[in-house]
């Protein structure tokens, strides 16, 4: 049933249209994977893997929420359609400082998504978790969520594509 709940969360993530629903669905899937990572109760290794996964996931969730709050403070919305509409218009001079909030928020949300897929600079948690988890759980949460989060990441990049000139250095750095 935990696996089915995680599959439901992954299916919901593809259909998310704002950052708050994406956060809730990502956390629902992460909670299922925390349980699956520490599924072997008699193994201290498995318990350690689940705990490391939980602590690093809780930290990165706070970063996601902080980034989302900066985006909301700068744009006044978290809906993807409204965000792309607002980003398509140039900001007036008196609102230019809000662009910095939006840029930092976009970077924080992007870092969170890259952390969730264990991309290169943000992959420090994955070897320990994969090593200590049961093999069946490792196969599940090392492949399936990455595909779904990448599909969400494609949607996210299409929303923030208008800011790409301002943050392309970040993408070059992590690439």
Residue map of PLM features:
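Alpha-helical transmembrane segments of multi-pass membrane proteins predominantly involved
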Residues: 1-175
């Amino acid at each position: 049933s935990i696996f089915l709940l995680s599959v439901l969360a992954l299916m919901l993530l593809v259909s998310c249209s704002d950052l708050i629903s994406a956060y809730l669905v990502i956390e629902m899937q992460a909670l299922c994977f925390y349980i699956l990572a520490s599924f072997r109760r008699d193994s201290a290794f498995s318990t350690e893997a689940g705990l490391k996964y939980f602590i690093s996931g809780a930290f990165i969730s706070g970063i996601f929420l902080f980034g989302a709050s900066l985006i909301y403070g700068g744009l006044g919305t978290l809906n993807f359609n409204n965000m792309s509409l607002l980003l398509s218009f140039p900001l007036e001079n008196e609102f230019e400082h809000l662009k910095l909030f939006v840029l930092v928020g976009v970077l924080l949300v992007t870092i969170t998504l890259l952390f969730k897929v264990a991309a290169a600079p943000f992959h420090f948690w994955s070897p320990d978790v994969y090593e200590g988890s049961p093999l069946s759980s490792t196969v599940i949460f090392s492949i399936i969520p990455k595909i779904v989060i990448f599909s969400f990441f494609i949607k996210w990049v299409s929303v923030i594509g208008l800011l790409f000139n301002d943050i392309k250095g970040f993408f070059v750095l992590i690439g």
